[in-house]
Amino acid sequence: MPKREIEDTQSPYSSTGLVSTGESPKTSTSTPTSSTNNRAATTTTNNTSTTSTSLLKSNSNLQPIAMTPSVSSTSLAINKPKSQENKRRRVTRACDTCRQKKVKCDGKQPCIHCTVYSYKCSYDQPNIRNKKNSGIPIPSQPSPAILQVAAQAAVAFGSNNNSSNQQSLQSLQQQQQHVVHQHQHQPLPADEPIPKTNLIIFQQIINALLPKLQLNGFDPNLQFDLNKFQKVVQYVMSKSQTFTLNLNEITELMQDPDSQIPPPPPASSSSSHHRRTLSVGSFDDSSNSAVSSPREVGLHLPSKEVALNLIYTTWNKACVLFRFYHRPSLLEEVDLLYSLDPMNYGDRQQKFLPFLYSILACGSLFSKTPYTMGTPSENEKNLEDDGFKYFLEARKLIDISNVGDINSIQTVVMMIIYLQCSARLSTCYSYIGIALRSALKEGLHRNLTLFQNSKKKLDPIEEDTRKRLFYTIYKMDIYINSLLGLPRSLNEDEFDQLLPVELDDENVTRTEYLFDKQQGRLSSSGCANQHTKLMFILSHIIKKMYPIKVKPEEAENSSNVNYSRDRIHAKVTELEVELKNWLDNLPQELKPIDPSSTTKDVIDEVPEKFRLANYYLHLAFLNCQIILYRPFIHFISDSMDGSSSDPRSLIRGRNCIKVARMVVKLANKMIDHKLLLGTYWFSMYTIFFSIACLIYYFHFANYNNNGQGFNYAGILFDDDLNIDMIKKDIEIGKKVLDNLKNSSNSSLRIYNILNTMFEQLNRRTASRSRQVTATTNSTTTTANTNSNSNSNSQPTTLPANFQNVNVKNTFENFDNMNHFVKKERERERESLSQLFDNTSMAKFESSSEIPKNVANIQRVATPLEENNKEIGEVSGGNLTSNYMPGVFDKLDTQIFGKILPPYMLEKNETMNYNSNNNNSNNVNNNFNNNNNAGEVNNNSNGVAYNNNAANWPLNNAEDGLNLEDLFGTLGNNGNGGTSSSNGLEYLDPF
């Protein structure tokens, strides 16, 4: 045998049968070889012929099939183990790069060779060897005699499907075997008609599925109503819920000439529409593979009309403030995709498909009917199932570990939007990290105008898409890090990318930016840019208010209480200035409107096109304020004496409660106008955190004082901290969550957690009230009498420390930021410098006394426990590295899984236990700070006291509220009230 033939015979790809040359294998050799090789070749030939004969005999009772000369060469491969078959499977088409370099290709997208060497992997070039059918090998041409015999057998089987004709079938099969042996090497006659192989396959399928119809596909005068058959199949499919066909019903309807086929019912979801199906296998269909190939999936696209509806839903609801793609270009790709046959999809369509599927997933999720109180309808369940199915298809079509182009990064971002309301935040955090690293790898963080030359320059659409995509990922990273308490992934001084151009998508073309057509109108990209600027301010708030490490120069002066107080309040004032400047620069269409206003004129001031963006921006703005003022909430909610606190801290604690109330009112207003979506994460977590603030304040500020409330700043706060008003707002917030709980899994988790808080706090409060009622009634009466006598005898005056200019400005800063009356621009600029005057902040020292007549009532209740000791309880509240966490910090940690910064954690000094004291009510841990560490004594009542805290008990044994029990319940540890876990164990984040 020549050397070339030996190589072909021994090639691992020659016996697979995928590529056949049409020549039968040779059984003799022309070159001298060893006797062993001759015997092996003879044995192989005999085995091949024997196997072929046995296969033909064993198939005598089966349906006749079209026999080809390649059967004898492939029969051995059928009986081989599956592992060998997978190893010998040959890829039918290599990528363009591998074909050019003449290297092996695994047929994947991208292939392993292009992945290793960072080549561009594409399948665009046509197949030179076979231009008619690129990528699909041509089988050897069968003999016409074989096809004729197979056709006769198929017709006989279809018309005589009973046991009486088995002899005729056997005779036909024997005739077929004889013809195969006789005509195996004969050339094809030119004038003999050849039956089509597809027609034979069609006849066999019809005979197997619908034998009663007795169709003869070889009859040139066949009378078959194809339109009626299609209507019958559609009608039967519409009646089935599982896509199973009743073949008997199809046969009966086709045989009945008078049958009336009713039209199929209208489709209720995208799952009922016509689907375009394509199997894009990687040609490595090994079932033993642990990870399936990225291309080994079944693509199920809905009809074009349904797809466009889902795309518009994603654009108008899910991506209101996230414009990271060019919509006209997207619609062009969709039109091109649906105009092509799935078998003709090229590299461009293969890269676009994952992005399209992710958009369809988000569109299905946001298409659910809002505010469904009962069990979701069947249509709602179908939408959710379709969304999950599209998400899985998108995830399978991309290699998440090797995201290397714009379409893939956009796919990951859209998957994040889908996951934020259906998975936990920790999952979103991982995907955001992948998207950000991929964007940095592609250079999206750099301003390419500095590097582009005239020969290779990006067009305006590509350039603007890069900007949009980068800033969308960056602000997602900022937001989720603020929720989870994790570090920022990228600093502002590490990128120089410009903000996207504020033009409508239609005015950004391949050639130029059409600024003249925009004419200064607000665009959707402009709304997204305003949200991006706000997220920058949120990043500054996290950096300045929640630092992980205190700078050395600031730590040196941290022992100075007045300096540390002024320093932290100076930072807050700077951040308030940033928020005020952002608010002043907003376009008129995005100016916040008063959530308490019920007049229709105020709402109509905002164009309907930008109404949803206006509300979402307002929620994001209020979220920034909550995070800004959140460290001060302990000053106004605990039972500690307000006289020891800085008035500015009290005011900013009051601001946190005011903002939380404002969020609840705004959410309720959005529900009234059907604009609030529970699937939108920016709104959902802001509402949740606001209600948690109100619940926290309502319980610890109200029940620490026997239901009377305790307003530290008196008349200055008016009704801002009124317990009854806050209780009403909590009920409104609960109603909001009732409406949103069925919108997404995140909404349902939030609803369940807050319900647990309601139940736990109410149960502990009721138990505590029964225990202390007898002892507190007389004390409360005396306190109220003294308070009334003091208020009657002395006029209510403001203390000196509240009359300071900086303290007044602290009030005005917040009120001016949340003042919804439109003022003249000049007046705003003039008042800005006055309101945020901070020149004397470094020298300001507040008085440590607040007269009793300023408070509504005297404090008559004992504080709860050590966990209620918050910042500001000693010497004006040292907001430095000795910041001590309180109840709300632990609540924050439990709910979000947020790890508190070191400066917010207690000093880990373990107290010396008294070996003679076995009282279970004693405190086991001493939460001290270095500057104010006091000794802990145990009295006969089993209550631990801190000597530096005016002998206030750290743990009240008579109090029925056990915070550890509450946190254990939130953590679902299954131990109930006997949980031994501490309050800083973390839940899995959302």
UniProtKB/Swiss-Prot annotation:
Domain of life per record: Eukaryota
Biased composition regions of type Polar residues, renumbered to the chain: 9-23
Key word tRNA-binding present: no
Biased composition (Low complexity): 24-61, 160-179, 282-293, 773-793
Gene Ontology biological process terms, A to Z: DNA-templated transcription; filamentous growth; filamentous growth of a population of unicellular organisms; positive regulation of transcription by RNA polymerase II; regulation of filamentous growth of a population of unicellular organisms
Nucleus as UniProt keyword: yes
This protein's UniProt keywords: DNA-binding, Metal-binding, Nucleus, Phosphoprotein, Stress response, Transcription, Transcription regulation, Zinc
DNA-binding interval(s): 95-121
Region feature Disordered, mapped onto this chain: 1-88, 160-192, 255-295, 764-800, 915-944
Single GO molecular function: DNA-binding transcription factor activity, RNA polymerase II-specific
Recorded phenotype for the gene knockout or disruption: Decreased hyphal formation.
GO CC terms: nucleus
Location within or outside the cell: Nucleus
Family: Belongs to the ASG1 family.
PANTHER family for the chain: ACTIVATOR OF STRESS GENES 1-RELATED, THIAMINE REPRESSIBLE GENES REGULATORY PROTEIN THI5
Record's function text: Transcription factor necessary to sustain growth on non-fermentative carbon sources such as sodium acetate, acetic acid, or ethanol. Plays a role in hyphal formation.
Protein name listed in UniProt: Activator of stress genes protein 1
Originating organism: Candida albicans (strain SC5314 / ATCC MYA-2876)
Lineage, highest ranks first: Eukaryota, Fungi, Dikarya, Ascomycota, Saccharomycotina
Gene responsible for this protein: ASG1
